[in-house]
């Protein structure tokens, strides 16, 4: 395949360590980052982290803060209103996946740089140049701005709710399926397949898989392993110029569930369930994946997430329609109701 131009979007610098939030002014100086800043953060816990960041900004820095709870197009518009008022040099996204997605999409739309400062390791959006924003035509990732820099404080991430940490593991293990789907599309549809980016995504999944052996014993070491996997996955997407290395049929299932059951379930949790199901379809040992996830307290049954059997089955039957241009193990026609029900029961997602 001849491509005239392939642009790789990657962060300029990644800072990972313990208590490094106190060194933010040093990092900003190294990168030539100056105020005014627009700080996008969440409420409650993430706002407390944002306050600590503010305390350690360069002396006399000018800034404005906006708090958001969701990742909708309306939230993006709210950020853009403040952008017009403040005219910031850079955006700082301090929070979980929703905050960072809104920040990077607003940065993209307004041609601004942004710094990613995650407060939880819930998914690989902390690095990637793509965002999941509700209110667009479909619940899939859209092009956004890659972070200029990422500042990851392991002490902070280790204190995030365990459910968010587990969701990050579920999201990353899903790359096992994404890469297999990509290979399948290359073989059957002649789609471009990047060996290096696929290998990087697969390595991230294997790293997260190893994390399931460690996280219960040593939370800080486990979180460090997980964050490295999440960063690698995001880098793979930046290199590929698409979400292909990190999003396959397991993500299509997750997006389908989000259409049917839009509240109360974490993206990474749905990807974890989708990974178990799609591993079965690919002929991978799904039982090992399920058992590893279960041992860390990951919800491996639909009812644990408040999902009905019908929602799971319906999601499986419509998953292939979410991104019809993205060929996966689900094929062009998807699964019939009876096939979807059988697979969901065999993999113990439903009883």
Curated annotation (Swiss-Prot):
Cofactor(s) named in the record: Zn(2+)
Record-listed E.C. numbers: 1.1.1.261
InterPro entries reported in the protein's UniProt record: G1P_dehydrogenase_arc, G1PDH, Glycerol_DH
UniProt entry tagged with the keyword Phosphoprotein: no
Localization of this protein: Cytoplasm
Record note on cofactor: Binds 1 zinc ion per subunit.
A GO biological process held by the record: glycerophospholipid metabolic process
A GO cellular component annotation in the UniProt record: cytoplasm
GO terms of molecular function: glycerol-1-phosphate dehydrogenase (NAD+) activity; glycerol-1-phosphate dehydrogenase (NADP+) activity; metal ion binding
Protein name as annotated: Glycerol-1-phosphate dehydrogenase [NAD(P)+]
Lineage: Archaea, Thermoproteota, Thermoprotei, Sulfolobales, Sulfolobaceae
């Amino acid at each position: 395949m001849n491509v005239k131009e392939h642009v790789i979007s990657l962060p300029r610098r990644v800072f990972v360590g313990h208590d490094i939030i106190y060194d933010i002014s040093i990092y900003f100086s190294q990168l030539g980052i100056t105020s005014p800043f627009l700080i996008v953060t969440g409420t409650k816990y993430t706002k407390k982290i944002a306050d600590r960041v503010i305390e350690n900004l360069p002396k006399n820095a000018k800034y404005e803060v906006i708090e958001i709870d969701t990742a909708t197009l309306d939230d993006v518009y709210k950020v853009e209103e403040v952008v017009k008022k403040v005219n910031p040099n850079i955006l700082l996204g301090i929070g979980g996946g929703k905050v960072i997605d809104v920040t990077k999409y607003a940065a993209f739309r307004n041609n601004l740089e942004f710094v990613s400062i995650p407060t939880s390791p819930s998914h690989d959006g902390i690095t990637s140049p793509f965002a999941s924003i509700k209110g667009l035509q479909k619940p899939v990732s859209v092009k956004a701005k890659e972070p200029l820099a990422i500042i990851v404080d392991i002490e902070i991430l280790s204190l995030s709710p365990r459910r968010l940490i587990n969701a990050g593991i579920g999201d990353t293990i899903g790359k096992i399926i994404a890469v297999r789907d990509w290979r399948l599309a290359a073989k059957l549809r002649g789609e471009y397949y990047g060996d290096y980016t696929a290998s990087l995504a697969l390595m991230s999944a294997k790293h997260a898989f190893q994390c399931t052996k460690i996280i219960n014993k040593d939370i800080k070491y486990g979180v460090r392993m997980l964050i490295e996997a999440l960063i690698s996955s995001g880098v793979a997407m930046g290199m590929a110029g698409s979400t292909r290395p990190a999003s396959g049929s397991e993500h299509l299932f997750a997006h389908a569930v989000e259409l049917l059951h839009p509240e109360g379930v974490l993206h990474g949790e749905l990807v974890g369930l989708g990974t178990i199901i799609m591993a079965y379809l690919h002929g991978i040992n799904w039982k090992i994946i399920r058992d590893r996830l279960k041992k860390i307290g990951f919800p491996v049954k639909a009812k644990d997430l408040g999902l009905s059997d019908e929602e799971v089955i319906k999601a499986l039957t419509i998953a292939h329609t979410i991104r019809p241009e993205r060929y996966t193990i689900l094929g062009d026609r998807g699964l019939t109701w009876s096939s979807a029900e059988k697979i969901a029961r065999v993999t113990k997602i439903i009883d």
